[in-house]
Regions:
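Extracytoplasmic beta-strand-rich oligomerization domains located immediately C-terminal to a leader/signal peptide
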Residues: 53-98
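Soluble periplasmic/extracytoplasmic beta-strand elements of cell-envelope proteins
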Residues: 82-85, 160-162, 183-185
Length: 186
């Protein structure tokens, strides 16, 4: 018969060696799942925002709905929400040029819209944030590209919601993106 007293020490040593590897694996799976959840949440918020403003809900009401939608994405220093309505200009210097006729952003997170960043002073205030001079103000022109080569026709509107947020991390050593961005075009 063998003496099992020496084997108990070996098992404890093997457990001590494998425990950090198993913990890293478990925490990595949890972090990756949490990151996927955050991506899904931001995408869902962008889609819901565009859905609301496409149904002629005021931008203020859409903003309030999105702020109550999630406790994880708060539109403060860590997140930004941008609502835009894009149309073709109907006259003046912006005739047949895609322009942002309505625009409102919430939050202080440094983010740039894919459509461009016209000054907030070019737009009226609450509740709908219409452009003051959509026919002649060159600063409200779309400077980015619309998705998939989308072209506007006269009288057509594209409702865009963009959500930018700083991703929160459970495990700091995972090389996942620090910023999440989602946009929805309706």
């Amino acid at each position: 018969m063998r003496d099992r007293r020496h084997e108990a020490g070996q098992a404890l040593f093997e457990f001590g060696v494998t425990l950090p590897i198993l913990m890293a694996l478990v925490l990595g799976v949890i972090e990756f799942g949490y990151a996927l959840f955050q991506v899904q949440l931001v995408t869902s918020m962008a889609r819901e925002g565009s859905n609301l403003i496409a149904r002629q809900v005021t931008i203020n009401d859409a903003e309030a709905a999105l702020q109550t939608m999630s406790g994880l994405v708060r539109f403060d220093a860590n997140s930004t929400l941008i609502f835009s309505v894009v149309r073709l200009g109907v006259g003046g210097a912006n005739n047949n040029v895609p322009i942002i006729v309505q625009r409102h952003s919430v939050g202080a997170f440094a983010a740039s819209s894919v459509l461009g960043d016209p000054p907030q002073s070019a737009y009226q205030g609450s509740p709908d944030y219409y452009a003051y001079d959509p026919d002649n103000d060159g600063s409200i022109r779309v400077s980015g590209v619309l998705p998939n080569g989308f072209t506007l026709t006269p009288g057509e509107s594209v409702y865009v919601t963009e959500v930018f947020t700083q991703r929160t991390s459970i495990v700091p050593f995972m090389p996942l993106p620090a910023m999440l961005h989602a946009s929805a075009y309706f």
